[in-house]
């Protein structure tokens, strides 16, 4: 299943990410089963800027959440994937890599502009299928 979460500011996205990690932890999801993917360099990601103490930028240890660029995670997978920093789906092939990495649950934190673009892309795809 996919859960989309809309944000309107960087601060709101950061808070949503922190809350999501806390919620997953309360549900019993182990940190090593969570990966945060970003289209940006990990050091430029909201996950790094909010200072999540459990985020590891290198291969994950027993208690860490891996933070990686979408491109660097190609060919890998995780039970739970969180895609952060989504402001546009202009590079859809990159996002396709990210959205296909989750084996159990996918969360996408997206801006309002990205949401509108995603809906437009879905409509275009559906219209093409009807032709």
Regions of interest found by a model, annotated:
Residues 1-131:
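Core RecA-like ATPase module of SF1/SF2 helicases and allied nucleic-acid translocases
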